[in-house]
A protein has these predicted regions:
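Phosphate/diphosphate-binding loops
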Residues: 256-257, 359-369, 373-374
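Short, solvent-exposed beta-strand edge segments and adjacent coil->beta transition regions
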Residues: 262-264, 342, 400-404
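Short glycine/threonine-rich loop-to-helix capping motif typified by GTGT followed
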Residues: 192, 346-361, 390-396
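Flexible glycine/proline-rich, aromatic-decorated loop/lid segments
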Residues: 137-140, 269, 274-277, 297, ...
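Conserved glycine-rich beta-strand-loop-beta hairpin in the small C-terminal domain of fold type I
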Residues: 322-323, 337-349
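PLP-dependent enzyme catalytic core of the Aspartate aminotransferase-like
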Residues: 309, 385-421
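Conserved PLP-enzyme active-site core in the AAT-like
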Residues: 2-34, 40, 44-55, 61, ...
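Short, conserved charged micro-motifs
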Residues: 276, 354-362, 410-419
C-alpha cells in the first residue's frame, strides 16, 4: 500500500505568531513609509519576505552548533564545512564569507573591472549591484520563455545558448566570466537543466571563458533535474549536484538558502589564481581565510545542512509545499510564474492589478495590499528591484513584475498556505 504524502520531519520547537487588526497594519505600514522592509517582525503575521536565513534548522544542526570550534585560525569546523563542499561540488579551494553577497563582493573585487560585461541568466539584485557598482554591465541572456508567465515549460531558468554565443562573439575580450544562477530567482525560482549547463560550458570553452555558478539554491535545481530531465530520474541528488558543478569553474553561495542556516556563505573554486586573489579581499572584508565572518558553530551547521538538504526526501517535502500553494492559487485563478518554482510563488502582478500602470509599480502596490489585507509580508521582485539603468537613469521595465512569496524551509504548515491563498 502506498501511503499518502507527508512531511519528512517532525516538529520539536515552535514560536508563537500573532494576528493584527487592519487598523494596526494601516498605521504600521504608513510609519514604514510603505516599505515592507521597514516593518518590525512582530508587525507581520506570516513572513514571506525571503527564504534566506529564515529557515528552521534540524536537531543535528543545532547539536553541531554546540560543538563548534571557535579557533581564529584553522578551526576544525572550517575543515568539516570544506570537506562537505569538496564532496558535493568537487571544488578544492573554499573561502568562507558571512553570506552570499559577501562572497560576490570578495570575488568580484578581483575579477570585475570598469567596462566589463558579465553575461548570465537574470542576475539577482545583489549580483547586478556588485557588477554595476564597479561600472561594469550585467547582460541578461535568459531564455525568452521566462517572460511568459503562463507558459508551462520545465526549465524556464535556462540561459539562451544563441544569445550567449552571439554576445561572446562580439564582446569576449570584455567578459571576465559567464555566470549562471541556479535556480534562477529573478525569473521565478526557475531551474536550469543539465543540458543547458553543458551548453553554457561548451560555449564558454569556445571563447576561453570561465563559468561561475551563483549557487544559493543549487539543491532545489538538482531536485528539478531529477524530476523533470530525462536520464536523471535514477540519480541521487548528490550525484546530480556533482555533475552540475563539473560544468563550472567556481561558485558563490549564500548558505542561508539551501544549506538551511541562518547565516553563512562561501566561495569555492578549482582555479587557484581566483582563490589566491580572493583571499586578499576576503581578509580585508570578511576575516581570516578559515572563518571569513562566520562562527565555528555556524560552519558546523552549514556542513550538516548541506549534507541533509541534498537528500531527496527533504527537498521533496519543501517543494511540494510550494506546489500546494500553487494549487490553491489556481483555485482562485491567481496568475503566477508557471510552473511553480523551487522556493517561492511569483505572482504576476500586472495581470492581477490590470488597472495599475507600470509607472506606478504594480508588484509593489500588490505587496502593500497583501500586507494590509492579511498581515502577510511578501517582496517585490520587479520594476523597483531592477533599479534604474546606470547610464540612462530610466526605469527598467523590460522584465517581469512579480510579488514574490518566498516560503521559509520547515517553518509554516499548509494551513498557513491556505491563509496566503
Amino acid at each position: 500500500m502506498e501511503l499518502p504524502f507527508a512531511e519528512s520531519w517532525k516538529i520539536k520547537m515552535v514560536e508563537p505568531i500573532r494576528k493584527s487588526t487592519r487598523k494596526e497594519r494601516e498605521k504600521w505600514i504608513k510609519e514604514a513609509h510603505y516599505n515592507v522592509f521597514q516593518l518590525k517582525a512582530e508587525q507581520v503575521y506570516i513572513d514571506l519576505l525571503t527564504d534566506s536565513g529564515t529557515n528552521a534548522m534540524s536537531d543535528r544542526q543545532w547539536a553541531g552548533m554546540m560543538i563548534g570550534d571557535e579557533s581564529y585560525a584553522g578551526a576544525t569546523s572550517f575543515f568539516k564545512m570544506k570537506e562537505m563542499i569538496n564532496r558535493l561540488t568537487g571544488f578544492e579551494y573554499v573561502l568562507p564569507t558571512h553570506q552570499g553577497r559577501a562572497a560576490e563582493n570578495v570575488l568580484f573585487s578581483c575579477l570585475v573591472k570598469e567596462g566589463d560585461y558579465i553575461p548570465g541568466n537574470s542576475h539577482f539584485d545583489t549580483t547586478k549591484g556588485h557588477i554595476e557598482s564597479r561600472k561594469a554591465f550585467a547582460v541578461d541572456c535568459t531564455v525568452d520563455e521566462a517572460k511568459n508567465t503562463q507558459l508551462e515549460v520545465p526549465f524556464k531558468g535556462n540561459v539562451d545558448p544563441d544569445k550567449l554565443d552571439k554576445f561572446l562573439s562580439e564582446k569576449a575580450d570584455k567578459v571576465p566570466f559567464v555566470i549562471v544562477t541556479i535556480t534562477n530567482n529573478t525569473a521565478g525560482g526557475q531551474p536550469v537543466s543539465m543540458k543547458n549547463l553543458r551548453q553554457v560550458r561548451n560555449i564558454a570553452n569556445k571563447y576561453h571563458k570561465p563559468v561561475l555558478f551563483d549557487s544559493a539554491r543549487f539543491a532545489e535545481n538538482a531536485y528539478f533535474i531529477k524530476i523533470r530531465e530525462k536520464g536523471y530520474e535514477n540519480k541521487t541528488i548528490k550525484e546530480i549536484c556533482r555533475e552540475m558543478f563539473s560544468y563550472a569553474d567556481g561558485m558563490t553561495m549564500s548558505a542561508k538558502k539551501d544549506a538551511v542556516v541562518n547565516m553563512g556563505g562561501f566561495i569555492a573554486t578549482n582555479i587557484q589564481d581566483w582563490y589566491d586573489r580572493a583571499k586578499v579581499f576576503g581578509i580585508v572584508y570578511e576575516g581570516y581565510i578559515t572563518y571569513g565572518g562566520m562562527n565555528g558553530r555556524d560552519m558546523n551547521a552549514v556542513a550538516i545542512g548541506l549534507d541533509e538538504n541534498t537528500e531527496f526526501d527533504n527537498l521533496e517535502t519543501r517543494i511540494k509545499q510550494i506546489q500546494y500553494l500553487a494549487q490553491r492559487l489556481d483555485e482562485f485563478n491567481i496568475p503566477y510564474q508557471r510552473p511553480a518554482g523551487g522556493h517561492a510563488i511569483f505572482i504576476d502582478a500586472p495581470k492581477v492589478l490590470t488597472h495599475v500602470p507600470k509607472e506606478e509599480f504594480p508588484a509593489q502596490t500588490l505587496t502593500i495590499e497583501l500586507y494590509l489585507e492579511a498581515g502577510i509580508r511578501g517582496c517585490e521582485i520587479g520594476y523597483l528591484l531592477a533599479d534604474r539603468d546606470p547610464v540612462t537613469r530610466q526605469n527598467r521595465f523590460g522584465g517581469n513584475d512579480f510579488l514574490r512569496l518566498a516560503i521559509p524551509r520547515r517553518v509554516y504548515t499548509n494551513n498557513h498556505m491556505d491563509v496566503i491563498a
